[in-house]
């Protein structure tokens, strides 16, 4: 039986029973992102992360619920601190780039003035030389 949702036509049995290729793709994506999540958790956590199961059906809540809530809150605080540090670093880089742009604008104006001044001196000397005033 075919159904249509937002312009996408699909077989309901295909949604309920995905092909082995789709299942393998989903499992490999789950595996990839679960290891990335474990690595990020290890970066922000002071506690070591337990080894991840390769089975996506495995229950990840092996720790007591209270401990995991406290640990999650601690991790959120650390992530917030890291985000604020990254924001501060980004702001510093932005301010430095603005300052360098202003300095570059000042140098460009000075270069233009020096070029203009020496060009006028050269024209004046050329005038005196041609009229035998020197």
From Swiss-Prot:
Keywords carried by this UniProt record: Peroxisome
Motif Microbody targeting signal per record, residues: 131-134
Encoding gene (name): PXT1
PANTHER family referenced in this protein's UniProt entry, alphabetically: PEROXISOMAL TESTIS-SPECIFIC PROTEIN 1
Protein's name in the database: Peroxisomal testis-specific protein 1
Localization: Peroxisome
Highest taxon listed in the record's lineage: Eukaryota
Pfam families: PXT1
InterPro entries: PXT1
GO cellular component, as recorded: peroxisome
Organism of derivation: Homo sapiens
């Amino acid at each position: 039986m075919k159904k249509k949702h937002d312009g996408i036509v699909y077989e309901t049995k295909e949604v309920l029973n995905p092909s082995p290729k789709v299942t393998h793709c989903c499992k490999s994506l789950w595996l990839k992102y679960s290891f990335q999540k474990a690595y990020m958790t290890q970066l922000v956590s002071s506690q070591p992360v337990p080894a991840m199961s390769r089975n996506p059906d495995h229950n990840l809540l092996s720790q007591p619920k209270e401990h995991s809530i406290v640990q999650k809150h601690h991790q959120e605080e650390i992530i917030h601190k890291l985000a604020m540090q990254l924001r501060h670093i980004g702001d510093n880089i932005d301010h430095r780039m603005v300052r360098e742009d202003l300095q570059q604008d000042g140098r460009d104006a000075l270069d233009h003035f020096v070029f203009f001044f020496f060009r006028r001196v050269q024209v004046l000397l050329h005038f005196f030389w041609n009229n035998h005033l020197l």
